[in-house]
From Swiss-Prot:
Gene Ontology terms describing biological process: translation
Gene: rpsJ
Gene Ontology molecular function, alphabetical: structural constituent of ribosome; tRNA binding
Cysteine pairs bridged by disulfides in the record: none
Protein name as catalogued: Small ribosomal subunit protein uS10
Gene3D superfamilies in UniProt: Ribosomal protein S10 domain (3.30.70.600)
Function statement: Involved in the binding of tRNA to the ribosomes.
Organism the protein comes from: Chromobacterium violaceum (strain ATCC 12472 / DSM 30191 / JCM 1249 / CCUG 213 / NBRC 12614 / NCIMB 9131 / NCTC 9757 / MK)
Keyword Ribonucleoprotein applies: yes
Length: 103
């Protein structure tokens, strides 16, 4: 599997969770002898919502809510078979979305 690259993109609402997951991936890849670039923090996506507080009147009274989506990007250069096996066995928390691409 030499001269390949694995690109891993992590997405989560909690930045502590995503940083711990990224650290686990980096440690696992380095332990198996691969070169890791990253994690690179990508811009945080912020979605804002305005919701009426009252079901009937008082249109001027509203709640403002937001959801922040944190992103991290990392590349694993020249992965070995051990690296791929270790990453497949890695157990990450449920709040982290992982996208893996082979390039």
């Amino acid at each position: 599997m030499s001269s390949q690259k694995i690109r891993i993109r992590l997405k989560a609402f909690d930045y502590n969770l995503i940083d711990r997951s990224a650290q686990e991936i980096v440690e696992t890849a380095k332990r198996t002898g691969a070169v890791v670039k990253g994690p690179v923090p990508l811009p945080t996506k912020i979605e804002r919502f305005n919701v009426l507080r009252s079901p009937h009147v008082n249109k001027t009274s509203r709640d403002q809510l937001e959801i922040r989506t944190h992103l991290r990007l990392m590349d694993i250069v020249d992965p070995t078979d051990k690296t791929v096996d270790a990453l497949m066995k890695l157990d990450l928390p449920a709040g982290v979305d992982v996208e893996i691409k082979l390039q």
